[in-house]
Amino acid sequence: MQLPIVAPAPIVTKHAEAFRDLFENVRQYQHFVNYLTGLMVLTNKSLSNIARCVLDSADKTNLSRFFSQAPWVEAAVNERRICYLLEQTAPIRHSANESVLIIDDTLFEHVGSLFDHIAKHYNHGDGTYPIAHNPVTSHYVSGAVRFPLDLRLYRRYEEITQWETFVHEHFPDRTIPKQKKARAKFHKEVDPILLHDPKFQVLHDQFKTKIVLAIELLDQAITH
């Protein structure tokens, strides 16, 4: 059963005002509070389902355009969220020495592949390679106070560099090995040559390991 969203949830109304100045107009702010309400009250939390359940919008693409086109800044909203939570929880948080920062890389698996930056990632829990996104996340824990801080999307080297495409372009007569060890050996053979291609070099420079992403999250957490 779908639950229609006729008004923002009371808890959203109570706290969302702290973010009001980050949006250019009332309509953007309404999309923001409607989306938060959908995340809290609906079982199916997909963007399309939340849009269907919002009754005050005749155009069900409005919410999608809010995320793809409206000029609000995601990083600014998240920064405000962190500062707001730290302010609200100051009386009950433990000292820094008694608090921890958790870094996690749990996969977010998908059934289909019609998503940006999706790939087969290694699941070190069961040894499989499901189709998934692989976010690296940071989570703050201080006694009873626990909330997420931020995330970075890990993208496999072959995906972010379009490696197979460049291999086929530069080595049209070579077959790319599928076995892990043979593929790693093939990388060592062809990658130095691919790096002479300026287009490949640009993509190569965008790659970040999970450790690098985790350090970025740690540095961000320290600033707070």
Question: Where does each model-flagged region fall?
Answer:
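Conserved, well-structured functional cores that handle cations and Mg-NTP chemistry
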Residues: 1-224
